[in-house]
Amino acid sequence: MRLAFGIVSLFPGGGLQRDCIEIARLVQAKGHEVTIYTCRLRDAGLADEIPVLVLQNDAKTNHQRQHTFALDFRRRTADRYDLIVGFDKLLELDVLYCADPSIAYRLKNRPYLYLLSRYRTFRKLERNSFARNGSVNIIFLSENQVIEYQSAWRTDFHRMSVIPPTLASDRKRPESRTDKIRKRVRTGLDLADDDWVWLSIGVQLRTKGIDRAVAALIEFPNARLLIAGLSDTNRASIKLAKHAQHLGVSSRITWLGHREDIHHLMAAADLLVHPARYDTTGTVILEGIVNGLPVITTAACGYARHVEAANAGSVLKEPFRFSLFVAALRRASDPSLRRAWSLSGAAYGADPTLYQGRVRAADLIVEAGFSKAARANIARSNTKESQACK
């Protein structure tokens, strides 16, 4: 089969981007041809042996960019491929790999947002895949998504599949928490032996709740916060960096920018602090667990259930209360409790199903291609029979 994958932005470090590339490789390894289409490519060598075609897109806003890309992708792929797969909400897809929350679900309680063109545009794209009696096969990353989309659109259950976690097995390196490696990494980050080190990871600072972690530093004078994903000079982080300065905690924050050595950062840290307002999955949560790093997170994250299942930290119930967040952090300041959480998390990481999500997604995509081909053959056969009877 020849398959086209569409994703608006392709850049290093993004979870959706890693999923797109790795699933493309898995499908290709099954003997099929895959071409990735995008309109924003930050690293030309990112996909290695997978062909990547960049469609010019001069839109100035995110919603205009996605809508323009959806139109261009549909035009460029029509009748040229056996299966069309979207990693963003696009148009006339065969399969959608959905990593986003439902716009329509959020608009139900905030109808005034319809006044904004961005929400109208995103809802229109969402409807194309999720409206009842549609034909798009949808791959979800968490059960939370099924509840949202079904509530908003009454999407047919037979079109929806939920895959296991998409954590790559090579991200599991609990052996990195040995004293030797831990000390070396902490020294390189200018961390003292008695510093209580929090790690937060993400590029969407407010969505991931990193502003909440910054605010909590006031309550813990011996805590240091490492923020991986953005530098303090990035446009998205300047506002929070200034706020940290206003709070008097900026000297205890280290902005690390984009990092590929996350397992080393997790070895150096004492706690993963991920008080997100929303996270479809929160793969970093699971990554922390299997690497023996205790986790403080919120129930708004799809993978928060793994924290409780592994007994590897604390999950804050919704709605979020800052006082309970501080209380959870205070409880996590106990080294013996963190040690127990660390051992439980590393043991939980031995479960092989935690690393099978991308394989399952590739299987579902290939199955969808074969099903589409079978339906087309039946339709052609019926047409020939009908013509023969005339």
Residue map of PLM features:
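Membrane-proximal helix-turn-helix segments that form the acceptor-binding/catalytic region
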Residues: Y119-L141, V146-I147, W153
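Short hydrophobic beta-strand element within catalytic cores of glycosyltransferases
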Residues: P294-T298
